[in-house]
């Protein structure tokens, strides 16, 4: 249990004190015993919504604990905070901004915020126009050749979300007049760019500079390198930059200075946080891959969850339940690491995306009022595609000393839709999908029940090093299939989970001040490494020593 709970005043009516008491009463209760006590546990601890099914019966909770968690949410005024989120209230208190990523997926006919909806759809329509032009082979480079490769240059929210979704929905790639490939570059060291550029032709390559501030050094250093690459091949003409770059940013003036043509500038707003921005024109690579209809389905899925989140009682509200279960595991069971385990290779980049979404949002230690937090905040979030992870770190999950909570994620169906082109080996692929599903179920069962999941006769002969303690809590999210609509739903679930937890912890999930100072210090060190400055006197001994090694001046 989190040590910070011990500091609370002994107000016996406080939901936190009641939850602490529940830990003391139920700490030795095993998941297998919870199922024995409640024959209808699966039905009682699962929710079906639209094309999603959420099973949390393998969590270490009881009906009483769930009621206390809901009471905690009410005590923290969660309903009022949800209403504030879905308004134009400046709930990003440290930056005095709204947090309106939900507005990016409003239907065009939405009447509650007509001006806001209009602004969003103007920019989306401008993006759709470019998508149609590129798909039709009508967008041409400086030499008149058709664009066949598009490279997204971004980092953080301008890379992780679009990259994750584009990879996950590759099966839904639309046909274009000429083959179109979408690539992603993010690392500031240039290694990705170096590997990619020799595969591309300058005449047929378009670059997206995706940066909310249009000032991120990682992104602009890569952009400057490709600009030099293009100008070396095609000449230093204005038309080269105007034809081969699209900008996505809040800063039109900076895009103008860089030379990007006005028609190739797609605008964001300050109220869109980077890690919440894939629904905006930051999602341009997604729309290029799955088409306008596919992108609109992605938005529709997220909007459906927005409606579910606002209008469903907490007891049946999936993002609220996900958040409260995380609070229970982290703050009361002292489980401070959480694994995301998708059993579908298309979700390869989901864990990395959720790491940013959760840890950059809720990795805070100061409350909204400027006081230190009273509870531990975000756990360490990590993960991998489940079948691969089984051969990497499941040993620790099953027999290690760390308590870990898990999310298992899987599509129910695959290889059965008309657009799939697997007819010649469909039967074998369906069998492989079933193999992945069977492993997903087996692992969650073994983590929960431990030895109870084993054959009794087998258990009698097993040495202790082959036995399983179990009692590792997990939830399972099943999607009818992995398509744009359902992926939009899945992402929005996690967005709102993060928000609910921020309310419980009384922190601001929409800033990221912790990442700012490191960038500034790097800018101070760069002139030293470049030889423009040699004063190391203000640096610590370790940094001085490392710089000397890097410069070949080690003593």
Swiss-Prot record:
Cellular component GO terms, alphabetical: cytosol
GO biological process: gluconeogenesis; glucose 6-phosphate metabolic process; glycolytic process
EC number: 5.3.1.9
Enzyme type, top EC level: isomerase
PROSITE patterns xrefs: P_GLUCOSE_ISOMERASE_1, P_GLUCOSE_ISOMERASE_2, P_GLUCOSE_ISOMERASE_3
InterPro entries, A to Z: G6P_Isomerase (IPR001672), G6P_Isomerase_C (IPR023096), Phosphoglucose_isomerase_CS (IPR018189), SIS_dom_sf (IPR046348), SIS_PGI_1 (IPR035476), SIS_PGI_2 (IPR035482)
Subcellular location: Cytoplasm
Source organism superkingdom: Bacteria
This protein's pathway: Carbohydrate biosynthesis; gluconeogenesis; Carbohydrate degradation; glycolysis; D-glyceraldehyde 3-phosphate and glycerone phosphate from D-glucose: step 2/4
Annotated catalytic residues: 360, 391, 519
One Pfam family linked to the record: PGI
A GO molecular function held by the record: glucose-6-phosphate isomerase activity
Keywords: Cytoplasm, Gluconeogenesis, Glycolysis, Isomerase
Record's catalysed reaction(s): alpha-D-glucose 6-phosphate = beta-D-fructose 6-phosphate
HAMAP family recorded: G6P_isomerase
NCBIfam families according to UniProt: PRK00179.1
Family: Belongs to the GPI family.
Stated role: Catalyzes the reversible isomerization of glucose-6-phosphate to fructose-6-phosphate.
Protein name (Swiss-Prot/TrEMBL): Glucose-6-phosphate isomerase
Organism: Acinetobacter baumannii (strain AYE)
Gene: pgi
């Amino acid at each position: 249990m989190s040590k910070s709970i011990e500091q609370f005043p002994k107000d016996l009516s406080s939901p936190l004190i009641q939850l602490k008491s529940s830990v003391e009463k139920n700490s030795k209760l095993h998941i297998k015993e919870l199922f024995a006590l409640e024959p209808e546990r699966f039905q009682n601890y699962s929710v079906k919504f639209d094309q999603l099914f959420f099973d949390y019966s393998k969590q270490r909770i009881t009906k009483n604990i769930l009621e206390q968690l809901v009471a905690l949410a009410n005590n923290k005024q969660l309903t009022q905070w949800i209403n504030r989120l879905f308004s134009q209230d400046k709930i990003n208190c440290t930056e005095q901004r709204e947090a309106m990523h939900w507005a990016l997926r409003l239907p065009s006919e939405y009447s509650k915020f007509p001006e806001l909806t209009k602004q969003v759809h103007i920019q989306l329509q401008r993006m759709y126009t470019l998508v149609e032009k590129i798909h039709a082979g009508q967008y041409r480079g400086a030499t008149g050749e058709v664009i066949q490769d598009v490279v997204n240059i971004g980092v953080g929210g301008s890379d992780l979300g679009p990259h994750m979704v584009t990879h996950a929905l590759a099966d839904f790639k639309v046909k274009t007049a000429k083959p179109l490939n979408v690539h992603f570059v993010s690392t500031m060291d240039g290694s990705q760019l170096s590997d990619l550029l020799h595969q591309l032709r300058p005449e047929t390559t378009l670059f997206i500079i995706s940066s909310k501030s249009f000032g991120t050094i990682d992104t602009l250093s890569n952009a400057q390198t490709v600009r030099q690459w293009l100008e070396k091949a095609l000449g230093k003409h204005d038309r080269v930059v105007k034809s081969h770059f699209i900008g996505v940013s809040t800063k039109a003036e900076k895009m103008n200075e860089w030379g990007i043509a006005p028609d190739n500038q797609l605008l964001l707003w300050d109220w869109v946080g980077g890690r919440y921005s894939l629904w905006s024109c930051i999602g341009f690579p997604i729309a290029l891959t799955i088409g306008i209809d596919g992108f609109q389905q992605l938005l529709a899925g997220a909007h459906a969850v927005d409606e579910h989140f606002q209008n469903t009682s907490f007891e049946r509200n999936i993002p609220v339940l996900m958040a409260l279960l995380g609070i229970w595991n982290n703050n009361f069971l002292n489980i401070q690491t959480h694994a995301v385990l998708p059993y579908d290779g298309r979700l390869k980049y989901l864990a990395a995306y959720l790491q940013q979404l959760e840890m950059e949002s809720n990795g805070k230690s100061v409350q909204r009022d400027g006081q230190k937090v009273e509870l531990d905040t975000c756990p360490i979030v990590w993960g991998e595609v489940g079948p691969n992870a089984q051969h990497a770190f499941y040993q620790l999950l099953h027999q290690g000393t760390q308590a870990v909570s898990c999310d298992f994620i899987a599509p129910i169906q695959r290889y059965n839709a008309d657009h799939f082109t697997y007819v010649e080996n469909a039967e074998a692929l369906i069998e492989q999908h079933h193999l992945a599903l069977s492993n997903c179920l087996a692992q969650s069962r073994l983590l929960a029940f431990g030895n109870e999941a084993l054959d009794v006769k087998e258990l009698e002969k097993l040495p202790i090093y082959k036995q399983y303690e179990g009692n590792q809590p997990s939830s399972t999210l099943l999607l009818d299939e992995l398509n744009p609509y359902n992926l939009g739903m899945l992402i929005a679930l996690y967005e709102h989970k993060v928000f609910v937890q921020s309310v419980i912890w009384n922190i601001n999930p929409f800033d990221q001040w912790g990442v700012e100072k490191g960038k500034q210090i790097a800018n101070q060190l760069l002139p030293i490494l470049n030889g423009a400055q040699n004063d190391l006197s203000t640096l610590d001994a370790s940094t001085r020593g490392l710089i000397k090694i890097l410069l070949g001046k080690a003593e």
